[in-house]
């Protein structure tokens, strides 16, 4: 089983943004991050999940996110009026795996969510 913690950040909305991912696997843990000069927090939240899913071979995994936008769009069928380009990529990746979705409260002391948050903000500051 693989656990993926994701977070997105934006300084201003829109503005410079970043995403961070913490991937926990049985024998290997690693971090990913990136950013964009002009984006939104929601785009960075979705991008974090996409990058996490793209970088694991495991078919059985749990994605943890503090974004109700991401979690509720995936699990409750919220309308995808914006960010269609990213939702299409995410839906394709999800269709290839068995993904369990878990919301985690942001800034609540969860070690891995906090690390993903630091990665995301670090990237946003670099832009």
Where are these regions (language model features)?
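RNase H-like nuclease fold core
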Residues: 1-43, 54-59, 118, 122, ...
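RNase H catalytic domain
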Residues: 3-16, 50-115, 119
